[in-house]
């Protein structure tokens, strides 16, 4: 991400935004003036971190608490933004699933269904929805991370 670039005319959608890499992307984008749509499954952390970002940078932050591994999550997220009149110019597709159990104690079907939906299908759909809009408006950028631990 370019440093010291004025992003005040842009809105960034960041998934997995309540912690880790997603949160740091949100902080850096806000520091450069970008308004944010922060998405996470963890409402408490999401609201706390969004408030910190607003307090330190003064940008507008929309928070959406959503499980992106659920069916039709990408469409629901995109529709929410459209209904609020939010135009996404920057997409940071970062949501992931972190399991703190030993792999031998984790149901392989659960990993397969939820993790693959989140890191592949939903990320792909969100990217396509946002990119179509970016192309229509002649600009934008996206980054996708797929992390599993």
Sequence positions of predicted segments:
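Flexible N-terminal pre-Rossmann segment of NAD(P)-dependent oxidoreductases
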Residues: 1-12
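Conserved glycine-rich cofactor-binding loop
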Residues: 11, 18-19
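Rossmann-fold scaffold of SDR-type NAD(P)-dependent oxidoreductases
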Residues: 15, 88-96, 144
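Flexible cofactor-recognition loop at the NAD(P)H-binding site
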Residues: 19, 96-99
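Conserved glycine-rich Rossmann-like NAD(P)H-binding loop of the short-chain dehydrogenase/reductase
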Residues: 32-48
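The beta1-alpha1 cofactor-binding region of Rossmann-like NAD(H)/NADP(H)-dependent oxidoreductases
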Residues: 43-44, 65-76, 108
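Conserved mid-core segment of classical short-chain dehydrogenase/reductases
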Residues: 75, 83, 98-112
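Catalytic loop of short-chain dehydrogenase/reductase
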Residues: 127, 131-149
């Amino acid at each position: 991400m370019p440093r010291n670039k004025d992003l005040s005319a842009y809105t960034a959608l960041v998934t997995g935004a309540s912690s880790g890499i997603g949160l740091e992307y949100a902080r850096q984008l806000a520091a450069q003036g970008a308004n944010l749509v922060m998405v996470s499954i963890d409402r408490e952390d999401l609201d706390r971190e969004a408030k910190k970002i607003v307090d330190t940078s003064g940008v507008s932050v929309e928070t959406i608490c959503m499980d992106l591994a659920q069916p039709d999550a990408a469409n629901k997220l995109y529709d929410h933004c459209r209904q609020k009149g939010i135009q996404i110019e920057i997409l940071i597709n970062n949501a992931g699933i972190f399991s703190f159990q030993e792999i031998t104690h984790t149901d392989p079907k659960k990993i397969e269904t939820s993790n693959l939906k989140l890191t592949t299908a939903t990320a792909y759909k969100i990217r396509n929805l946002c990119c179509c809009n970016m192309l229509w408006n002649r600009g934008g950028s996206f980054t996708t991370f797929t992390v599993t631990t």
